[in-house]
Amino acid sequence: MYKYLDKVNSPKNIKNMSIEEMDLLAKDIRKFLVKSVSKTGGHLASNLGVVELTLALHKVFDSPKDKIVWDVGHQSYVHKIVTGRKDCFVSLRQFNGLSGFPKENESPHDIFDTGHSSTSISIATGIACARDIKKENYSVISVIGDGSITGGMALEALNQLGYIDTNMIVILNDNEMSIDKNVGGMSKYLSSIIRNSTVEKMTDEVDKILNVTQTGEILSKTAHRFKDKLMYSFSPQDCSFFDSLGIRYYGPIDGHNTKELIDILRKAKHKKGPVLLHVITKKGKGYRFAEEQPDKYHGVSKFDIKTGVTSAKVKSMSISVGEKLVDMANSNENIVAITAAMPSGTGLNLFESAYPKRYYDVGIAEQHATGFAAGLAKNGMKPYFAVYSSFLQRAYDQVIHDVCITKKPVTFLIDRAGLVGNDGETHHGMFDLSYLNSIPNIVVMAPKDTREMELMMDLSLKLDCPLAIRYPRGSSYYLDKGEYGEIVLGKYEVLDDGQDTVILCIGSMVKHALEAKEILSREGINPTIVNARFLKPIDEGMLKALLKNHKNVVTIEDNIVTGGFGSRINKFIIDNEYNVNILNIAIPEEFVKHGNIDELYDFVGLSPKSIADKIRKLVIE
């Protein structure tokens, strides 16, 4: 089916390929990626942009002896294809299938598990230093995007790397995008290198002087070949930032010119000390729809190749949050919105359009975003920081130090709480209830559905304290169960009365609990269902009344079992010496693999059927 790709099952297969053959292989790979991802979904645009770069890396270096560390890792599909996993792409990001990120247990060519941004330079530096201590001889390469290099961890790593002067290569894959358009001073700086390169200016002047006559065309081509050579030379005027750190800069380099890439990688391989190669790529290259809308094809569901159309989408929880925040801001000039490089993913692109002067995209910088929000709150603003649960982990100290100790009224809109599905371990939001539970002075809420989420956002305006609202990935939904009036701080809601057994559930697990009750009621088991709404504070009055009339207490949460909602209820029961049977249903204390969300709920025991089975066993015993 693919003339050149079908011959590749190992990096060894491309070692003797000519440049022309590698370019034809690149075309095959792009066709394969578009066809494959159209059937499974996945990260498309970023992988289309790194085809030539990945092939050049595997031609010049000897993986896995030479260590290639992929930042974030969503752009590692071509690497997986070259290292013998092409036939596994039918199961990409599916349960027990091929991961969308590097996995050490999947291939020896995957040097390190990654998933979050800005980590690769630190990891690669550690590998390089260990190599030096052991007096081993191999290359270490970090591949990082221009969005990721703005992250604090990446800058910290560059600071050390230049100082210790070890042999290492950093490849800066610059496509001017992270997921959305890049922002910030570093992004401007990198763009200025591209725009203002001394060599580019020189060749432009050559073109003008020669006026592109027939003779001029020949001389101009010669000048451009000369330019290509000079591109590899260090330019102190343009690249003083990297130079000042002690890291030698080469670039900008055409990331789609296979020969240029191979030449510069071979030179960098033998350079002493740290080297940074600034490679310019086009996100989505080779597929028109992805080139035109790279943000839409960053992470994409199944789509039609001919039209680029994905399956119809209903409104997401994130969009509902964005719409509600805009509505609140219409009548409150103090509301400001903050994102850490995820405006579309969090729904804040809507706020940006409505109130650009009250909207801040701080880049991949969750720590800074949290401290920044605290400063805004200090000076009278009402900041809302919308952030994925797994990314808020990076700002744990700032949540404590800058927000909660000082009781600043910052609201965290925690998106992607609970299991998220196909992205796996690094992206599940399964720890936030636990890590927020341990922090004083913060109110933590989780709505049963979209309408209750909006009511919780209304409540946030009335409270002058740190506050978090967590909600799941996926479509907006309405349970039409219970009351939808004004929410009172710390008050639970009884959705269904029953006897003997009470189920205390929070957030999206309310829906699962109600479905589990439908199963149990057919067997004569009739538990009381309580929508707890709050991790903290707890509704002590309702809990005392419930514990007097029920002998079995079940808690359900889409969070790790240790330290979260169940643990808080357990403590109340123990402290008040109630004699009841307790069952905590939650995510087991282990990292959860990737897969379809319903398969994962069943896998961890949080599907309605699994919940019903556990409660049945408790009641019968």
UniProtKB/Swiss-Prot annotation:
Catalytic activity: D-glyceraldehyde 3-phosphate + pyruvate + H(+) = 1-deoxy-D-xylulose 5-phosphate + CO2
UniProt xrefs under InterPro entries: Dxylulose-5-P_synthase, THDP-binding, Transketo_C/PFOR_II, Transketolase-like_Pyr-bd, Transketolase_BS, Transketolase_C, Transketolase_CS
Keyword annotations: Isoprene biosynthesis, Magnesium, Metal-binding, Thiamine biosynthesis, Thiamine pyrophosphate, Transferase
Residues where Mg(2+) binds: 146, 175
GO molecular function: 1-deoxy-D-xylulose-5-phosphate synthase activity; magnesium ion binding; thiamine pyrophosphate binding
GO BP: any one term: thiamine biosynthetic process
UniProt xrefs under HAMAP family: DXP_synth
Record-given protein name: 1-deoxy-D-xylulose-5-phosphate synthase
Phylogenetic lineage: Bacteria, Bacillati, Bacillota, Clostridia, Peptostreptococcales
Gene: dxs
